[in-house]
Amino acid sequence: RPDVGIVGAKLIFEDNTIQHAGVIIGFGGVAGHAFIGQDRDDNGYFSRIISVQDLSAVTAACLMVRRSVFDEVEGLNEEFKVAFNDIDFCLKVRKAGYLVVYNPYAQFYHYESKSRGQEDSADKVARFQQEIGLFGERWGELLENGDPYYNPNLTLDKADFSLKE
């Protein structure tokens, strides 16, 4: 479909829980994975774990994009050295008029952070904080207004789509 710019997959941790079933803008203050930690066979809120759907973003750990779309939005922003480069990329693709689609029928095991490591040193924490600031500068209006694919009556404190308290 020419209106689809990016397609992302369902990613599973080694323990058969969900690592990624889409990204919600605002989780953790910036962006986070929907349904993280839930059993891989759960259906989730309104069956969202098992439904093909449009989202604001998906993780670049496993996504597909046409070269023409990648070039049109000038690829990944190198200012985001590690964190949020994929979210920024997806948002640029959406801004260009394309859809970002989560496809739960494409499923893979993902050993998160095996290649990059954890944010466990002062330098890494400083870089991460800088990237949070940069994301806020670029996408502050979206952070303020909320993810258009997420109900504002639901909490951003948990990845299970539960009601705000």
Language-model-derived ranges and their functions:
Residues 15-16, 27-55, 100, 117-165:
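C-terminal, non-catalytic tails of nucleotide-sugar-dependent glycosyltransferases
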Residues 1, 76-77, 151-152:
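Acidic/polar residues at beta-strand termini and the immediately following turn/coil
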Residues 47-74, 78-109:
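A short, conserved alpha-helix in the catalytic core of glycosyltransferases
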Residues 2, 84, 88, 123-130:
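A general alpha-helical scaffold signature found inside nucleotide-binding enzyme cores
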Residues 111-114:
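Conserved active-site-proximal loop/helix segments of enzymes involved in bacterial cell-wall
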Residues 1-30, 99, 105:
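Conserved donor NDP-sugar-binding/catalytic core segment of glycosyltransferases
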